[in-house]
Amino acid sequence: MIMETDVKNSRYYLNRELSWLQFNKRVLQEAVDTSNPLLEKLKFLAITSSNLDEFFMIRVAGLKHQKENGVKRRDIANMTPTEQLENISDACQKLVAQQYMHLKGILKELETEGLVFIKPVDADERQKQWMGNYFEREIFPVVTPMAVDSSHPFPFLASKSLNIAMLLEKNERDEEMDEENDIDVKTAIVPVPSVLPRIIRLPDVSEANSRHCFVFLEDMLMFYAARFFVGYDLLEARAFRITRDADLYIDEEDAQDLVVEVERQLKKRQRGQAVRLEFEVGTSRFMRRFMTQEMNLEKEDMYQIDGPLDMTVFFGFCGIKGYNHLRYPEAHPHSPWSMLDLKRTPETNIFDMIREKDLLIHLPYESFDESVVNFLYSAANDKDVLAIKQTLYRVSSSSPVVQALEKAVQNGKQVTVLMEVKARFDEANNILMARRLEKAGAHVIYGLVGLKTHSKCTLVIRREKDGIRRYVHVATGNYNASTAKLYTDLGILTCNDRFGIDASAFFNLLSGYSDPPIWDSFIVAPINLRQRCIELIDREIHFAKNGEDAHMIAKMNSLLDKGIIEKLYEASQAGVKIELIVRGICVLIPGIPGISDNITVRSIVGRFLEHSRIFWFRNGGREELYISSADWMPRNLNDRVELMVPIEDPEIKRRLKQMVDIELSDNQKAHIMQADGTWLKTISAENQLCAQEYFQKIAEKRDAEDEMTLAQKLEPYTPVLGHGDGSD
């Protein structure tokens, strides 16, 4: 008999950081997936690098602080900060080596398409002449070489900046010094200007030539380095890159003005402690020792790079004109299915549609502009709308959402916005947007002390013939027009009275001193979301112990909360079938005999970033479905304001169940977690089904067809969920 306390044993949990690195490895695998176009494979390398940058700036930096402060506390997997850092370094060294091995293969493939990266020394005479002129005209005036000696201390180098370290010696040395073997070696740093293009296209031999050559800016700088140090011989020149701690340390309790304090901390971000040094392969021991000593780094913080440093440079290159055949076909968001059959006359507005039925929006396949932005602009311009209230966590830099809110203020609406200024790496943009809204005349609040407001909710108050009506939008993803084209998310537009009453109470809780109400539909963190999730799992345990069919499915970005995982293990032991779809971190281990036999975990990594959270519980045949802004992580359940809402509309429940069904049937982009914590990608040659492609095809083809009829015309999939027994 398995003791309940067994589920607390650390051997049943993975380390958070190593689990995240496994996720980034899954992203890296897309760079060698032959189903992806060539430039998209290159983009996945850039994504992997961007992910690693943030990982070091936040997660590794935090662990280094713990180590320096003597913290010995063990994590969920029984690892100390020091042990975690050692394991992270080993895993990252292997991951980076794989990255650059894959890059070499992709660059060779690009050569067959006529896109060739060369070193300046390998350029022909015509190209070298052009490079020399370009260097003198465009580069030399901008670059500032900096000596490093007793009168020139090692310069401050910004996080993620690219630099060149150089060793020099006088080309006319003192003979006595030569006799004594005391060569006077100088060191210098040349920052690679970020204001100049990093990838430089060389002129083609002719217009008809199909071979296009490119060089990296740092290679050109090193090729012409002698121009900066007249009278010196160049002994060595190597590119290197520093990553610094970028977390913000904000004391909200003592801060008199939160926005001012965030701005103050943002100024410190670029000057954080160095946490990683990347340098070119072939860098001498003397140069490595020189750089690590100056930046107070250890051996485990050093990464030797066999290729161009910072692959995020390829984000821009992947958009090169004239090579559409090397990219995904352009994906255009389509009209939301829920709205198609409601567009009857030009006079029909979105409020008419919502009154007729709840609307489901499935991003990025369905249009954010036609749904959410339309909803906000309609509210801004509608003479009967009295007020708009909205939470904003991340918005795009030229946000149509903010523009709609500004328009609403101009039209005399009461506009209240909770702008979360602590959204990591979006702090500056959010502060800018908040000040724009304040200047327009909106009421802007900045959340609750000690909590990030991560929920996605909009409330529109409208006067109608039969009285005041509340229109509500709740979603799993941000009000960000840019990421709405890249992330898979779900949103609901409704005028359900229970949602409306709860939404009013929710905004009162955020803006004033109101005590939490007794919620009718909303489930709110950190108030009762954790408790409700535990209750829902307990209910399935009850059914299983009574011999009934017990089944639950949860889709999220990350699974980290130990309390939730212990409950999932308990449910598995009781016989509950548990299917988890987790894109990123998952410290739960499935398939452990006697502990998690009934749990499976899959992760879908593809063209779009899986971001929606869906929770399905069989509930003895009376199925319940929820969507949420929250993952099952301590920060979401304890330290953030989050929302989870039940899905009540039968049509939306049916559609959501079909979505989950298809994702559980994906056999092209799904990775299955094994009982040893590793992941295995599933690729089937028969009955191929890629969930993201499937949803895209439906969005493209269903304008005049019933969705279920259309589904029969697409690739078949095997249903996983039972759709009978009172499923609606």
List where the protein language model places each region.
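Glycine/threonine-rich ATP-lid/beta-loop region of ATP-binding domains
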Residues: K562-I565, Y569
